[in-house]
Amino acid sequence: METKTAKILDGKTLAEKIQKELTAQIIEVQAKIGRPPGLAVLMVGDNPASAAYVRNKEKSCAKVGIASFGKHFPQETSQKELEDVIAALNQDEQVDGILVQLPLPEHLDAVKLLHQIEPDKDADGLHPVNLGRLVRGEKGLRSCTPAGVMRLLAEYEISLRGKQAVVVGRSILVGKPMALMLLEADATVTIAHSRSQDLKSITQNADILVAAAGLPGLITADMVKPGAVVVDVGINRVTDANGKSRLVGDINFASIAGVAEYITPVPGGIGPMTVALLLQNTVTSYLQTAKESGALDVK
């Protein structure tokens, strides 16, 4: 009997496609308005994972033609210093997107800093104004990871209308905006989390299952409905018996691949899509600024 294997939702390939589209768009618009889009990434301290993420973002910016205004601050940087930097970036006409790399040192108020970013420069889509626009179904900058999930599902023409969707995780970064985006696409949405009773019975009903709890291997094959679409948002670094570290998601990929219809890998699934949508948000802000200034005549 032939063993069924789920089709891979290839985020890496789609992210490269999006980057090529953005590159062409930037070349065309820059010739008209005289400057490239700009993204400022603020990092505080020396968290190795954060440093790697920032390098990846800056590399991706360079690839598509976005100017990077990266700022790296020492661990002891004060709240006021960062607030002053954000205030200046809000006024800087060369900067279209601002991102505060999380996590921040404990003495800093991350929420207050995120709220200070001008909503139209909120590259991460986490400002209350942009989240409010999402709730209302209005246009606005969307949270990058869930927006990346939606773009990936659309690329593979996976219909969401009327489907049962379960999101495991309720963070403001992924879980909550993910549920809202699925709802906006006419799915029937359930949010589960670490306090949910009988998680298995909830996930087994999902036509679309999004794992975003940050717990390696949380979702196993017996928790998945046969033929479901399984999206793994988790990025967890684990160490094996030989002391080697590797990235894994929130699902048991090997076993679930024999049950699901579609599945995302880690790495190579949602991670590249998150970066691609960050670039997309920056370019969206860039185009909007150009239109408002009259430098770009777009219908």
UniProtKB/Swiss-Prot annotation:
Organism of origin: Trichormus variabilis (strain ATCC 29413 / PCC 7937) (Anabaena variabilis)
Keyword Hydrolase: yes
HAMAP family linked: THF_DHG_CYH (MF_01576)
GO annotation (BP), single: purine nucleotide biosynthetic process
Gene Ontology MF terms: methenyltetrahydrofolate cyclohydrolase activity; methylenetetrahydrofolate dehydrogenase (NADP+) activity
Stored InterPro entries: Aminoacid_DH-like_N_sf, NAD(P)-bd_dom_sf, THF_DH/CycHdrlase, THF_DH/CycHdrlase_cat_dom, THF_DH/CycHdrlase_CS, THF_DH/CycHdrlase_NAD-bd_dom
The protein's name in its UniProt record: Bifunctional protein FolD
Subunit comment: Homodimer.
Gene Ontology CC annotations of this record: cytosol
Domain of life: Bacteria
Biological or metabolic pathway of the protein: One-carbon metabolism; tetrahydrofolate interconversion
Gene: folD
Described function: Catalyzes the oxidation of 5,10-methylenetetrahydrofolate to 5,10-methenyltetrahydrofolate and then the hydrolysis of 5,10-methenyltetrahydrofolate to 10-formyltetrahydrofolate.
